[in-house]
Amino acid sequence: MAFNVRSSGSAVAGALLIASAVTGWASAASASAASLGEACCADLEDRIAELEETAARKGNRAVSLTVTGYIAKQVMFWDDGVERNAYVTDMGPTQASNFRFMGNAKIAAGWSGGYMIRIQDLSSNPMALDQFTSAAGTGPNVQMTYWYLASEELGKISVGKNAMASKSVAMFTDLSGTQVIANYVLFDGNAFFLRQGGELLKLRWGDFGYCYSQQRPWGGDCDGIVMNGVRYDSPAIAGFSMSASYGEDDDWEIAGRYQGEVGGFKVSLGAGYSVNTDELIQPPAVSFHKDSSFFQAGGYLQHLSTGLFLHAIYGAENNHGAETIRGGLIEPDAHQWYLKGGIRRQWSPLGATIVFGEYGEYIDQLSPAALNAGATGSELSRWGLGAVQEIDAATMSVWVRYRRQDVDIEGAQLDGIVAFHYLSVGSLINF
């Protein structure tokens, strides 16, 4: 049988041509798909890298990581007798909006180690506001960074930037749910200038609530600041615990605390004593040969069935005759006391409602500026009323609070100081 070679060769050539075209199209399609896949994956990998950079994560499996904190802001309406205005503020240093990174790891039975990093927002610090300054602050501030080693039987030792043993020991006895909102520290209103008649003076309200221990116009909690140091806390035994600390350079503190229930009452007690000899604890220096000691005691009593409560604080600062750098004047010994009473009841399904009144006096807490103005004694008084509504579903509190402060000054032509009034409306939400 004879084959037509020409015809057969043409058919083979045609088949090869078609196969080549199909193969080329398939290769092109495969290359295109690969290119699209690479572009897609590259975008996805970039996004994953972005998320990894911003995600909170545990550094290892042994140590836990908890992120917590709160946001607290208020609108403060103030009246100095002539001028009126409204500012949006935070709650003051050490109580400002913050977030905390806390870690813990179990080492052995009854033993653990951990750390704490606390960063606060000081961008709207009320202690820096006055008639001419509506917004002031330093922005984010690393308030605490420390590690600790804890034993259930022996207690806990902490090293780093931390609250020392007696910091706020009297103030933190307040379990009413209003401690951040209303306390005896002059967090708001202290930087405003005094007004005598219609004239503004160079002196401020905080010049009559001055603490030499920390060289700031705190009013109360005079040695209440964090610093680099070492702190020891004992285990709680039947509700009682003790603390001791050393901070640079030099600050020694001891404190005792109790919390419990006695005869149908919730009880919280605290007392502390500190000695500070660091002229540069918070620059600029104000003292020659500083030697400030501060004693504080506080308590809280709440009747469990009715919700009626009382919170009380006493503080006394002794400066042992130290002289101020400017003018060579003697730093006065001073004291303060504070009462807050009210009721805490759940009248609403939202959560507890707290209604309270407060009163405090700050005696002879004269700053270097007040001493140089000729003041020899003073009595700054402050009273207020407030209400707080807790919202349990959001771990949130909202409040309204009114305060008035007055001052009587001895030894200087400073009679007729006009009272300062302010009303605050705000909220705090935990996370």
Residue spans for each PLM region:
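Surface-exposed coil loops of outer-membrane beta-barrel proteins
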Residues: 83, 87, 126-138, 158-243, ...
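C-terminal segment of classical bacterial N-terminal signal peptides
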Residues: 19-30
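Transmembrane beta-strands of outer-membrane beta-barrel proteins
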Residues: 65-73, 109, 113-117, 157, ...
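Beta-barrel outer-membrane channel/assembly domains of diderm bacteria
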Residues: 3, 31-167, 225-226, 230-235, ...
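Solvent-exposed loop/turn segments connecting transmembrane beta-strands
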Residues: 222-227, 243-254, 331, 377-379, ...
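Outer-membrane beta-barrel and related beta-rich outer-membrane complex signature
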Residues: 81, 127-129, 169-178, 283, ...
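Detector for outer-membrane/organellar transmembrane beta-barrel domains
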Residues: 255-390
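Bacterial N-terminal signal peptides that target proteins for export
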Residues: 2-15
